[in-house]
Amino acid sequence: MSANPIRLFVTHAWLENDDYTRVFEYLEASGTFYYFNSSQPQAKQPIDKESQREDLRRQIAPCEVVVVLPAVYRLAPELVLFQMNFAKAADKPIVAMENFGSTEPLPKAIKDLADEVSAWNERNLIDALRRQARHQETTRWDTIDFKLD
């Protein structure tokens, strides 16, 4: 599987935030999920709007799935909507993350364009990415140990 990693793009506004970093902490925590990140928030932000959009198109084009962060949407809604609309136009599935540490509902624009919404949980996120990017169903089961008295 490491020879064929899932290619993903995580929404950004040319700056990393806590949620952006957290996505990769969750993905790396499993130790068995291999991915290639095509997003480049650390790159120099293009000056004009059309150059920004062209740069985002270039970053999204090679990916198999797009991860949308509501925190980035709050910072730059127009930019995130462009990223989501381009992903849809390019036939890329979208996994939207719930708001981290909050019960606040996702913005309607995100819910309407997302193919799947994932909780902030390593297993849920990885399963959603596998389902959307490669149509792989996981066969994991939860096991609960309990003692009878």
Where do the language-model regions lie?
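A charged, well-structured terminal subsegment
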Residues: L125-I144
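Conserved TIR/SEFIR loop-to-helix hotspot centered on a Trp-containing motif
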Residues: V72-A89
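Conserved N-terminal substructure of TIR/SEFIR domains
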Residues: M1-P62, D142-D149
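Glycine-rich, charge-decorated loop segments at or immediately adjacent to ligand/cofactor-binding or catalytic sites
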Residues: G101-V117
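Inter-motif core of Ras-like GTPase G domains
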Residues: E64-V68
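Short beta-strand/turn micro-motifs composed of small residues
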Residues: H12, P70, E98
